[in-house]
Amino acid sequence: IGEPPATRGYTPSVFAMLPRLLERAGTSEKGSITGIYTVLVDGDDMNEPIADAVRSILDGHIVLSRRIAAQNHFPAIDVLGSVSRVMYEVVDKSHLAAAQEMRQLMAVYAEAEDLIHIGAYVKGSSPKIDAAIQKIDGINAFLCQDIYEVTSYEETEKRLLAAVGKTAEPTAPAAEPADAEAAS
């Protein structure tokens, strides 16, 4: 008759096949393959079994949000819902620190957003919320890009640093390749 359904109607073999399918991309003795996969989740539920399984396998994921798109913010990337497990290997320390600070500011703002919008937040109550309020417009401007806008990596990094109130300082990569292997 076949396999019995397990998680939300998906059979166990689906979850067994995902790593084999997704890990075909990668490095081998013959070269490397980069894969960009698209996963449409049921009802925008990021904890849906397939989405959850795929996120656990991949080195990172970019979450697109209908809510952000409805605000005419493009690309409609949910930064707080997106993750890169290799970022520390490919950016320098100042870039990594700025990206982490931006995520923290966005998270603080998201936590307090309802209070801010209804006027219940009193300025000075929390230095973290005050900093997030001060920088959120610059962060959102940094995260918006016109469909025809082309920005170099260097310009993007400069704008990221400016969005969180930092200046560029040349530094070493956040992690040396040997450090990255030891960390995994």
Q: Could you tell me what each predicted segment is?
A:
Residues I1-S184:
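P-loop NTPase catalytic core
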